[in-house]
């Protein structure tokens, strides 16, 4: 008697695929023999579009890649442009960037843990964590005018200084947030059903994690303490005191714990940013990069012309190439820029962490049940804006 396998299409409209993932599963009963992800359904040609935009006009495209953690991607692009321009960034702007990068990490991890719990069948964590996410989105809105696509980080600094009382409100948020995280831990950490669904599921060894190019919680969950904020610090991360949480077994449960612990570390970094926040400018004083203030534009025709030309023609970037990466919530997000000396990039290559993680889905899900595939997709923390680009 021969074993007959069946082919099952999971997605692209299934809610548990976290986007437009079409997963072709080869099944032996309920056991997965092979998982073949088909991507590209959200491809928008972002890298090509950026070639036809000025460096300033390119920033909003980065918000729309991993739209769950937009500011971290703006950060990578801003660092890459600054590297080519060899411009300095005011210290206040660097602290603001680090502050909002860590708020963005919390924004990302709360959604991941909440949606992962929902996929498995627990509704409560999602509702609790969305209350906290709403508060961070209000901080986004107050600083940039937008809840999601912020367009806030700029080459040479940030778009605007922090509004009045914002630091006090962020401080109030991080004072009460650990108790909410503690509630989630009490609900899930030793929960029998939660552990049955996560422990020993989707195990990634240290060798596999390295071979497949994993980064972020996917790498640290396997016990490798690699974090760009420590190994290759940017802005003022070298002045921050924080730990890099790592797992032991490389399973879904360890990756969940790593994300929980990372949020506690983000709180520590945010506190340090608030305490150490210096006074001063938030944009470089180079007039080629920084538009004149509204006050100056009301007084000077030259300032008005300067503002108009800056936003229509942009600024020229010297010939050269660079690669800059940041420790985004999902892993290493990198931007390779190649300039031929004009006001638009000749080439902008984007390295998204989720792309490498999704390729590992096949070996992670082999031999598991179809219900476990849902858990593994959730632990990958994939967003198709950055994978398909």
From Swiss-Prot:
Keyword list, A-Z: Cell inner membrane, Cell membrane, Membrane, NAD, Quinone, Translocase, Transport, Ubiquinone
Pfam families linked: Complex1_49kDa (PF00346)
Keyword Acetylation: no
Catalyzed reactions: a quinone + NADH + 5 H(+)(in) = a quinol + NAD(+) + 4 H(+)(out)
Annotated InterPro entries: NADH_Q_OxRdtase_suD (IPR001135), NADH_UbQ_OxRdtase_49kDa_CS (IPR014029), NDH1_su_D/H (IPR022885), NiFe-Hase_large (IPR029014)
Subcellular location(s) of the protein: Cell inner membrane
Bilayer topology term: Peripheral membrane protein
Enzyme class label: translocase
Single GO cellular component term: plasma membrane
GO molecular function: NAD binding; NADH:ubiquinone reductase (non-electrogenic) activity; quinone binding
Primary localisation category: membrane
Domain of life per record: Bacteria
Family matches, as Gene3D superfamilies: Cytochrome-c3 Hydrogenase, chain B
EC number: 7.1.1.-
Family: Belongs to the complex I 49 kDa subunit family.
Functional summary from the UniProt entry: NDH-1 shuttles electrons from NADH, via FMN and iron-sulfur (Fe-S) centers, to quinones in the respiratory chain. The immediate electron acceptor for the enzyme in this species is believed to be ubiquinone. Couples the redox reaction to proton translocation (for every two electrons transferred, four hydrogen ions are translocated across the cytoplasmic membrane), and thus conserves the redox energy in a proton gradient.
Complexes and interactors: NDH-1 is composed of 14 different subunits. Subunits NuoB, C, D, E, F, and G constitute the peripheral sector of the complex.
NCBIfam families per UniProt: NuoD, PRK06075.1
Protein name: NADH-quinone oxidoreductase subunit D
The species this protein was found in: Rickettsia prowazekii (strain Madrid E)
Gene (UniProt): nuoD
């Amino acid at each position: 008697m021969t074993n007959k396998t069946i082919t099952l299409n999971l997605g692209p409209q299934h809610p548990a695929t976290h986007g437009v993932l079409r997963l072709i599963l080869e099944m032996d009963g309920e056991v997965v023999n092979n998982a073949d992800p088909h991507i590209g359904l959200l491809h928008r040609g972002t890298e090509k579009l950026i070639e036809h935009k000025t460096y300033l006009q390119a920033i909003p495209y980065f918000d729309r890649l991993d739209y769950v953690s937009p500011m971290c991607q703006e950060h990578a692009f801003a660092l890459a442009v600054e590297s080519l321009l060899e411009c300095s960034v005011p210290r206040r702007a660097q602290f603001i960037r680090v502050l909002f990068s860590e708020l963005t990490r919390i924004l990302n991890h709360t959604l991941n843990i909440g949606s992962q719990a929902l996929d498995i069948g627990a509704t409560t964590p999602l509702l609790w964590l969305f209350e906290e996410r709403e508060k961070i989105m209000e901080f986004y809105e107050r600083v940039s005018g937008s809840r999601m696509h912020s367009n806030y980080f700029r080459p040479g600094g940030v778009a605007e200084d922090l509004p009045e009382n914002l630091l006090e409100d962020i401080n109030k948020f991080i004072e009460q947030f650990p108790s909410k995280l503690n509630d989630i831990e009490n609900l899930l950490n030793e929960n029998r059903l939660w552990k049955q669904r996560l422990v020993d599921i989707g195990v990634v060894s240290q060798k596999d994690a390295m071979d497949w190019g994993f980064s972020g919680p996917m790498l640290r969950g396997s016990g490798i303490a690699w974090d760009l904020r420590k190994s290759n610090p940017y802005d003022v991360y070298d002045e921050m005191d924080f730990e890099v949480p790592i797992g032991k077994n490389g399973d879904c449960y360890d990756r969940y714990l790593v994300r929980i612990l990372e949020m506690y570390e983000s709180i520590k970094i945010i506190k340090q940013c608030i305490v150490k926040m210096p006074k001063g400018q938030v944009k470089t004083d180079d007039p080629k990069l920084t538009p004149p203030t509204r006050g100056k534009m009301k007084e000077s025709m030259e300032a008005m012309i300067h503002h108009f030309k800056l936003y229509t023609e942009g600024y020229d970037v010297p010939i050269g190439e660079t690669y800059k990466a940041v420790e985004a919530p999902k892993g290493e997000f990198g931007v390779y820029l190649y300039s031929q000396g004009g006001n638009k990039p000749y080439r902008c290559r984007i390295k998204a962490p989720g792309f490498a993680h999704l390729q590992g889905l096949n070996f992670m899900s082999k031999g598991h049940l179809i219900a476990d595939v849902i858990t593994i997709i959730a632990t990958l923390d994939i967003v198709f804006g950055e994978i398909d680009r």
